[in-house]
Amino acid sequence: MRFPVPLVPARLVRRYKRFLADAVLEDGTELTAHVANSGAMLGLMAPGARVWLAPKSGKTAKLPYGWELVEADLGAGPELVGVNTMHPNVLVAEAIAAGKVPELAGYARMRREVKYGVNSRIDILLEDDDRPPCFVEVKNVHLMRAPGHAEFPDCATARGAKHLAELAAEVKAGHRAVMVYLSQIASARDIRLARDLDPAYGRAFDLARTAGVEAIGLVCRIDAQGIEVTGTIPMLG
């Protein structure tokens, strides 16, 4: 995935009300950017941190910029971390189409945002003529508290637990269901559950895995030009 327009470097002032961040451009211009991330973003919000913003245009844009990347030292030295949680679905779909996810290869058709469960939409639905459909739910991973070990979630997520239960129901119905955890931290060697931050999600994950829901970890290469899935990493649960 390439960014459609060049990103603009800035310095973070603060993030507040979940979806807003104040920043200062290199020329001293102060602005407010949209934050497409409802999580706690632990370790990614230090005042003065270097950030990269995407200019927004069009009648629907309420703010002139959206926050895309932040430079953070998560134990392996400064690196770029993707904070926009709107991108993972696109990135995973691209990776599946490019054959970078062997576990999800070979399906004839791919659809996105298909209604299922209780007032939910599955991120990716893979279909074939000679095997059951595969329901794929994607989660963005941007938490790292120990070098190399990415974690999910970074705060309590009742919605995430609901998705796990709905995937388990699909397995019971004879379908295939897969949770994909996408690390937007390139130094991640594996992904683990942050059970201390959301014990309920950990329990829901265990129940889903016992029911037959699969779990896959992916990692990305990130720079100011774009983000690309580079391959799979262990999802340890």
Swiss-Prot record:
This is Sugar fermentation stimulation protein homolog. InterPro entries: SfsA (IPR005224), SfsA_C (IPR040452), SfsA_N (IPR041465). The gene is sfsA. GO terms for molecular function: DNA binding. It comes from the Bacteria. CDD domains: SfsA-like_bacterial (cd22359). The lineage of its organism: Bacteria, Pseudomonadati, Pseudomonadota, Alphaproteobacteria, Hyphomicrobiales. It holds the Pfam family SfsA_N. Belongs to the SfsA family.
